[in-house]
A protein has these predicted regions:
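Core catalytic region of metal-dependent phosphoesterases/phosphodiesterases
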Residues: 6, 11-97
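Short, conserved loop/helix-junction motifs that constitute active-site signature segments
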Residues: 22, 57-59, 181, 201-204
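Active-site neighborhood of phospho(di)ester-bond hydrolases with catalytic His/Asp-centered motifs
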Residues: 5-7, 28-32, 64-68, 116-117, ...
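Active-site environment of divalent metal-dependent phosphoester hydrolases
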Residues: 10-15, 36-39, 70-76, 122-124, ...
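PAPS-dependent sulfotransferase catalytic domain
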Residues: 88-117
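Active-site-proximal loop/helix segment associated with metal-binding centers of metalloenzymes
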Residues: 106-181
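Binuclear metal-dependent phosphoesterase catalytic core
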Residues: 199-230
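A general structural motif
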Residues: 1, 23-26, 60-62, 112, ...
Length: 230
């Protein structure tokens, strides 16, 4: 199993690069935040979102589209889920795009002991804030089920990101929060935290890969995970 992880897009045109790689992997996971930008135009942002939606429709089993916090403010409302870069003139347009294609997106993806979310899962958040135990054996399945139910803890914003919670949930968790105590027993791939280059960090025996490095616009940056599947 070869998985390509692509960091936060924020309106960037990645159509040619993504299509050039899609045949070289088993999964291509986009880490969310397709919208909002201080550099790109409204039309570029809309084109970016429609590009990944088209990719998902064309390769439904191969492409994974994760939700990001910037996407949520249009899907569920800026007043409750607002963040920087909000474009009021695009609110209705992006709400319509996300709502009409909601089933193409998900909060989390899991392969073996690796979990992909936009911002990461903090162990304390999982144990003491989320507490949404529905008997799932798959962490991602439980998170996706909870998202469909709009479980409030999923949208927690920690102090480091200007919120009132001790730590953020999987849409808002800050890098330093995550590195302090990531979810026990699982490696993670996350976006959300801008890095100059893709960063591989370790916490005890666990690995956390930060892939939000696409702001280096001179090249298409992505991370490859290779798994030996039985």
């Amino acid at each position: 199993m070869k998985i390509i992880s692509v960091g936060d897009l924020h309106g960037r045109d990645v159509a040619e690069d993504a299509r050039g790689l899609i045949g070289q992997c088993d999964k291509m996971i986009f880490m969310g935040d397709y919208v909002d930008s201080f550099e790109h135009t409204d039309q570029q942002i809309l084109d970016c979102l429609r590009t990944v939606i088209d990719l998902k429709k064309e390769y439904p089993e191969k492409v994974v589209l994760l939700w990001g916090n910037h996407d949520i403010q249009y899907l569920l409302g800026h007043k409750r889920h607002g963040c920087s870069g909000y474009r009021p003139q695009m609110d209705l347009m992006l709400y319509t795009e996300f709502t009409c294609h909601r089933d193409l997106f998900q909060l989390a993806f899991q392969h073996k002991d690796w979990i992909w979310t936009h911002a990461g899962i903090h162990d304390g958040w999982w144990l003491f804030s989320f507490k949404y135990n529905m008997g799932f054996t798959n962490i991602a399945a439980e998170l996706n089920f909870a998202f469909d139910k709009k479980e409030e803890a999923l949208f927690d914003v920690g102090h480091r990101r200007g919120g009132y919670k001790d730590v953020g949930g999987p849409l808002w968790c800050d890098r330093l929060e995550l590195l302090n105590k990531p979810l026990e027993g699982y490696n993670q791939v996350v976006g959300h935290n801008k890095r100059e280059f893709i960063e591989r960090a370790r916490w005890k025996e666990l690995e956390i890969v930060f892939v939000d490095a696409l702001h280096n616009d001179d090249k298409f940056v992505y991370h490859i995970s290779n798994f030996k599947d039985e």
